[in-house]
């Protein structure tokens, strides 16, 4: 019996030592697993986003709960409750700490999201999406260009009106330059690739049958060379055109952005400036056209060669030669012919004593045909002015043909 008691006591000691070994190994395994899990969640918290952190916290909670259940099962099987009770306590405290840290991070993320959404709402509510008379502290075009009282708002109003006048001024200058360059091109033929019809280099061509002079026709230039190989003067003109177009386009787009602020003060400033500047520079165009037409008539009268080849319509027709009239008359009576010759001599002497108007007095009043031609030209000029006033005067259009003649 004593041997059996000793054997049973030895078995109990072996079992207790085995259970202690198993418990200690389980505890060390649980602690290692918890430490590795905590390290994993910390690294994931630092590298992952807010949504990934929330999913990692859920995974950690499930892992900790499964490990706690495993440790509780091992402690009940081994019977060593005291040694295993400390392990769930530490794991619970670690889980509580991690949960609190995760809740803090989630709170920070929610606060950040709420603050950003609040800023977005403030910005969206600060922008105008419809016409409004409110202009106070609303920036237009630039960050510091805003008005907080009526005086500053009126100053911005005048700024946009002046910008509209500058835009129309650039268009008017471009139109004047195009007319001037076109007139100079046609008058002097310096910058044109077209050879003049009256050029001396072309020579003179005669028709032997009809015995009259045929002027040389201009040569047709190469279109590609005119477009891609311009002269230096044409290139200089293109640079001026590019500068004017760039500046005017920039101003009109800035005015468009000002109207997109939906502030009525700025919208009416742009509309008022464009309307007034259009009327003003349209009047300037009409005055310039009238002035150029008068200058053209004066230049034509000064360069007119006189009667016989009159081009201005202000020189009288030459009187018929009395000698030629006397020679054309036919008669059989010799005395009658002599009398006519005497009369013609008397007429010649009287004609020599009289002053020739074209030689001493210059241009007289226009004859009936000249008056009719002048009236026709004036009617054409009035019709052209009416057409220009009724339609939009595009600055890119070439001037009328009446400005291309000398």
From Swiss-Prot:
Sites bearing Phosphoserine, chain numbering: 344, 349, 369
Region (Disordered): 71-117, 318-406
Phosphothreonine sites (modified residues): 356
Protein induction: Expression is induced by copper deprivation, and repressed by copper sufficiency. Expression is regulated by the copper ion-sensing transcription factor MAC1 through the cis-acting copper ion-responsive element 5'-TTTGCTCA-3', termed CuRE, present in its promoter.
Predominant localisation class: membrane
Side of membrane Cytoplasmic, spans: 1-152, 272-406
Intracellular or extracellular location(s): Cell membrane
One term under GO cellular component: cytoplasm
Region (3 X 19 AA tandem repeats of S-M-X-M-X-A-M-S-S-A-S-K-T-X-X-S-X-M-X): 9-65
Any GO BP: copper ion import
InterPro entries: Cop_transporter
Residue ranges annotated as Extracellular topological domain: 174-250
Compositionally biased region (Polar residues): 349-375, 384-395
Pfam families in alphabetical order: Ctr (PF04145)
Single GO molecular function: copper ion transmembrane transporter activity
Reaction catalysed by this enzyme: Cu(2+)(in) = Cu(2+)(out)
Topology term for the membrane: Multi-pass membrane protein
Domain notes: Within the N-terminal cytosolic region appear three 19 amino acid repeated elements containing the M-X-X-M copper-binding motifs. The REP-III motif within the C-terminal cytosolic part resembles a shortened MAC1 copper ion-sensing motif (REP) and plays a role in the CTR1 degradation.
Assembly, per entry: Homooligomer.
Protein name: Copper transport protein CTR1
Taxonomic source organism: Saccharomyces cerevisiae (strain ATCC 204508 / S288c) (Baker's yeast)
Gene: CTR1
């Amino acid at each position: 019996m004593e041997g059996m008691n000793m054997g049973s006591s030895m078995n109990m000691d072996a079992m207790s030592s085995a259970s202690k070994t198993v418990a200690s190994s389980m505890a060390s395994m649980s602690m290692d697993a918890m430490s590795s899990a905590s390290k994993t969640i910390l690294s994931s918290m630092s590298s992952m986003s807010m949504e990934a952190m929330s999913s990692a916290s859920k995974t950690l909670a499930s892992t900790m709960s499964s490990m706690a259940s495993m440790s509780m099962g091992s402690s009940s099987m081994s019977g060593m409750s005291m040694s295993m009770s400390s392990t769930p306590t530490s794991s619970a405290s670690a889980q509580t700490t991690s949960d609190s840290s995760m809740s803090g991070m989630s709170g920070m993320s929610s606060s950040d999201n709420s603050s950003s959404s609040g800023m977005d709402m403030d910005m969206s509510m600060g922008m105008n999406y419809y016409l409004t008379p409110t202009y106070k502290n609303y920036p237009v075009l630039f960050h510091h260009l805003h008005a907080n009282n009526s005086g500053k708002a009126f100053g911005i109003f005048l700024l946009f009106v002046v910008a509209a006048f500058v835009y129309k001024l650039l268009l008017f200058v471009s139109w004047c330059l195009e007319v001037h360059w076109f007139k100079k091109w046609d008058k002097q033929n310096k910058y044109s690739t077209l050879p003049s019809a009256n050029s001396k280099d072309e020579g003179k061509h005669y028709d032997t049958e009809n015995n009259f002079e045929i002027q040389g026709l201009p040569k047709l230039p190469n279109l590609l060379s005119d477009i891609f190989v311009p002269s230096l003067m044409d290139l200089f003109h293109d640079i001026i055109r590019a500068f004017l177009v760039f500046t005017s386009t920039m101003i009109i787009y800035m005015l468009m952005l000002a109207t997109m602020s939906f502030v009525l003060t700025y919208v009416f400033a742009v509309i008022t400036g464009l309307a007034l500047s259009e009327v003003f520079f349209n009047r300037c165009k009409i005055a310039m056209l009238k002035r150029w037409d008068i200058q053209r008539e004066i230049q034509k009268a000064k360069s007119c060669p006189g009667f016989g080849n009159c081009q201005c319509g202000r020189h009288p027709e030459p009187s018929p030669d009395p000698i030629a009239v006397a020679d054309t008359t036919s008669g059989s009576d010799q005395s009658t012919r002599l009398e006519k010759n005497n009369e013609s001599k008397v007429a010649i002497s009287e004609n020599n004593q009289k002053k020739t108007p074209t030689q001493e007095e210059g241009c007289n009043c226009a004859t009936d045909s000249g008056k009719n031609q002048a009236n026709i030209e004036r009617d054409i000029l009035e019709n052209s002015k009416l057409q220009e006033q009724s339609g939009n005067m595009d600055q890119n259009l070439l001037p009328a043909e009446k400005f291309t003649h000398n």
